[in-house]
Amino acid sequence: MLWPASEEFAALCRTQLELVVNSLGASSLAVYLSETLNDSPSWSPVAVYPEAASLLSLAIPPTLPPPTQVPETSLSHYPQQVVSSLANQLILPLMYQNWVLGVLVAQRQHRPWLAAEQAQLQQVAQTLAIACVLDQRQQWLSHSPAQPLDQRQQRFDDLLHQLRNPVAAIRTFVKLLLKRLEPDHKGRPLAEGIAKETERLMALLEDYRQQRNDIPALTGSQPLPLAGKPLDLAETLLPLISAAQARAEMEGKTFVVEIPPQLPPIWLEERVLQEVVGNLLDNAFKYTPKGGTIGLRLMLSSPALELTVWDTGCGIPKEAQPRLFERGYRGVQADSGIEGSGLGLAIAQDLLRPYGLSLRVTSPYAGDRGTAFTLAIPWQMKVEP
């Protein structure tokens, strides 16, 4: 059972809907959360834009399964984006692991949604899903007995770090939007307001991280299960690629993508792959100076598909590399003046460990500079935790 959404979560939803309206020209949007996690469908609106919009015009198709935990064999019913029976309407599930917590419904009257726009909506849905988990855990804490302190701190630190990446991507999209809006454009004040609220959210996340609030798991002491399923790599990585391209333009860097055609599917939890690659890309951008290059490359070999995130930054000293995946370790970067928590690589490695996978680091990568992180995923067998 889900707790009712807090006022803070509802306010975050409204801010994200305003961003979508202003940047993508949506005519109406809504965020629904499930009121129960059982076999009876029950959806409750949390935020609607514009506020006077009729919920009937943003109806959830009856074909959408009930809000519940989705077994691996049924995951095909919950694609990242669902085109409804209504014209120009998208429905994106707010998913955390295999749990459908709610849906984001977006409607636009005069033109269909482009692939890049759908990728931006997926970023918004991902942000709202993680924010919903944080909100639920906060409420769970106030109604539940204490859990072991170290366990709660570690799980909450991980979630805060995972939330920073999609919020940072939204911040980048807003900055790009402001660069393209004329000073007298009627939508500029709204975009500036969204930019300020996004910066405020990032500051709050950093403040919460430093305070290390004690927040337990959504379902108590038992973690939600991982489940492997066949993934289309190009489609799965599209939201991350779109965000990286926007960030490269904003920061004066080059982003290179190398994805060969006709890749075989791999069996891996979609959320796991996106979190791992998202953390690697975030690190690559942070430690690559202006004018540098960041790359994402997929290479098919036997018996594994190799995914590599590389950069032309300053590199990682050999003596620091054995400790890269320790929680909180930043090495020489701790004195660089670049913000960081030292959690990204540790989280990535922890997410991969149940599948028997791990990251491999190469530094220097190009000449005497740069760093590359490679993930080898067997594609001739199903990978299960």
From Swiss-Prot:
Modified how: Autophosphorylates, possibly on His-161.
Domain Histidine kinase stretches: 158-381
Organism of origin: Thermosynechococcus vestitus (strain NIES-2133 / IAM M-273 / BP-1)
Function field: Member of 2 two-component regulatory system(s) Hik2/Rre1 and Hik2/RppA. Transduces PQ (plastoquinone) redox signals to photosystem gene expression machinery during the adjustment of photosystem stoichiometry. Reduced PQ suppresses its autophosphorylation activity (i.e. kinase activity is higher under oxidizing conditions). As part of a two-component regulatory system with Rre1, controls expression of sigB and several other genes in response to hyperosmotic stress. May transfer phosphate to RppA in a possible Hik2/RppA two-component system.
Protein name: Sensor histidine kinase Hik2
Binding positions for [3Fe-4S] cluster per the UniProt entry: 13
UniProtKB keywords: 3Fe-4S, Iron, Iron-sulfur, Kinase, Metal-binding, Phosphoprotein, Transferase, Two-component regulatory system
Protein's UniProt keywords contain Nucleotide-binding: no
Reactions it catalyzes: ATP + protein L-histidine = ADP + protein N-phospho-L-histidine
EC number: 2.7.13.3
